[in-house]
Amino acid sequence: MKAVRYHGFGSAEVLRYEDIERPVPGAGQVLVRVAATSFNPVDDHIRAGALTEMIPVALPHVPGIDLAGTVAELGAEVSGLEVGDRVVAMLPLDATGAAAEYVLAPAEALVAAPRTIELVDAAALPLVGLSAWQTLFELAELKPGQTVLVNGAGGAVGGLAVQLAVDAGAQVTAAAGPRHAERLKGYGAARVVGHLDLAEGPAAVGGPFQVLLNLVRIAPDEAARLSRYVADGGVAASTATPVPEEPARSVRAASLFVRGDAAQLTELVARVDDGRLRIHVAARRPLVESSAVHEDAGTGRLPGKTVLIAP
């Protein structure tokens, strides 16, 4: 079968499109015919060797944490699934990924794919959806009626976080570039502002806020200034550069290390199917272009969430 692999860490050039053996499912495993995976920034960091201590992957490595596909074969001791089922999953961060025609997945990680969108587009949901969910509801402990600032709302995690927060009854201010403004308004954000000018301070965007989500990589001194956007007794939850806590103001801080969670993913799928959660796919590209997609991400040319369609 065809797969994307790298045999050593490095730039996007280490990614190869090559033939490898089709895997055979063992006990508790499911062989999935991949429809698509998607690019996530963590794929870039793992490939570059920047996360070898946190996420130790064996070389050669097939990337692709997100999976959307169809069950092709069941291993022993697998129940609740049948050949032909459409499924999605967030694969373990250190496992062989879905940038291939077939992939082995732990049976417990698989959930039924959304019925109301194309299967390839469903690959854009798992990792970013779980990141948004866990940041909002586990780290920030979001409650109805709270004010929320999403910094980096134009990205894949940000767009889902805005929708989830609005659905939870929060008053959401979304900070993002102008090309995302109409989409974010459509998601129900009470206020959409441009990229934050930290020199202007929180009052310029209607702050401070009870909850701050920082989804943007910024310098540590900028993160310290961003803490001013959190109201006394509030929380700053980050998927990127952490915002420091301020005990004197009872400002709590937390950072995400996303994990797979089938129950949460099932809930996200249900919200997609009932129209409460919209997935924005900016580009669909063939798997063979994986190296170019990684290169585009590194140079800022990627238009947004990109799914990679298997052959």
Sequence positions of predicted segments:
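Glycine-rich beta-strand-centered segment in the early N-terminal region that forms part
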Residues: 21-39, 51-94
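NAD(P)H dinucleotide-binding glycine-rich loop of Rossmann-like/cofactor-binding domains
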Residues: 56, 89-152
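Generic structural signal for buried aliphatic residues
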Residues: 87-88, 148, 212, 236
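Mid-domain Rossmann-like dinucleotide-binding core that forms the NAD(H)/NADP(H) cofactor-binding site
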Residues: 125-195
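Glycine-rich cofactor phosphate-binding loops and adjacent beta1-alpha1 units
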Residues: 173, 185-254
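C-terminal hydrophobic helical "lid"/dimerization subdomain
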Residues: 265-311
